[in-house]
A protein has these predicted regions:
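Class I SAM-dependent methyltransferase SAM/SAH-binding core
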Residues: 1-35, 56
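Structured loop/turn residues at beta-strand edges in well-structured enzyme cores
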Residues: 19, 37, 42, 173
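Conserved Class I S-adenosyl-L-methionine
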Residues: 116-184
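Short conserved AdoMet
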Residues: 18, 52, 66, 111
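N-terminal regions of ATP-driven nucleic-acid and macromolecular assemblies
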Residues: 9, 15-20, 101-103, 172, ...
């Protein structure tokens, strides 16, 4: 009697799943929905960092699991986007990237013996222009930030400082992704 429920606060993201999928529109900042049965698996890819208080949310998710339940998590963490931060600093502008949780702040909320897997991977994307790397982030709302947005002229100024890292004159955008498998 197990099934997969796809949960998101974005109707656009929910609508990307098959019509046959079980889906629920839900704002995870309000906590998890009240389900008739406690979940045996919570899987989250690039969601937790959008939420207010990701650490508190992770602790709630852990506490909501059934006995022997698991959380599988992929989340960008602090240390992501060094190129963006470098360009902003050199352009004397505020980096408007979303502030991400630290590796330690996430694992601190779960007992160490319950962490089955904990690894950080650096993923580097390259393109001819930084805008090609940033536009897909904007498409999924990843440009959201607590910082005041830059004007178009400020963006142009920032992009002129984006570091070029290879002989092909390509630019990069690097992500630090934490992968966690947690068992209750």
């Amino acid at each position: 009697n197990q099934y997969v429920l796809r949960l998101d606060n974005s109707k656009q993201m929910i609508d990307q799943h098959s019509e046959k999928s079980t889906k629920q529109l839900w704002d995870l900042n309000d906590g998890l929905p009240k389900w008739p049965k406690t979940p045996s698996l919570l899987a989250s890819s690039f969601v937790l960092h959008w939420l207010d208080n990701p650490q508190g949310q992770l602790q709630e998710w852990f506490n909501s699991l059934s006995s022997e339940g698991c959380i599988a998590l992929a989340i960008p963490i602090k240390g992501s986007f060094p190129e963006w931060y470098q360009a902003a600093e050199q352009a004397n502008l505020t980096c408007t990237a979303l502030e991400l949780p630290t590796h330690d702040s996430l694992i601190r909320v779960v007992p160490n013996q319950n962490i089955l897997y904990n690894k950080i991977e650096i993923i580097k994307q390259t393109a001819a222009k930084a805008t090609s790397l940033l536009k897909p982030m904007i498409k999924v709302g990843a440009h959201s930030s607590h910082e005041e947005q830059l004007s178009i002229s400020d963006w142009r100024h920032l992009l002129s400082f984006w570091p070029i890292h290879n002989k092909d004159k390509q630019v990069s955008l690097s992500w630090s992704i934490q992968f966690l498998l947690i068992k209750r």
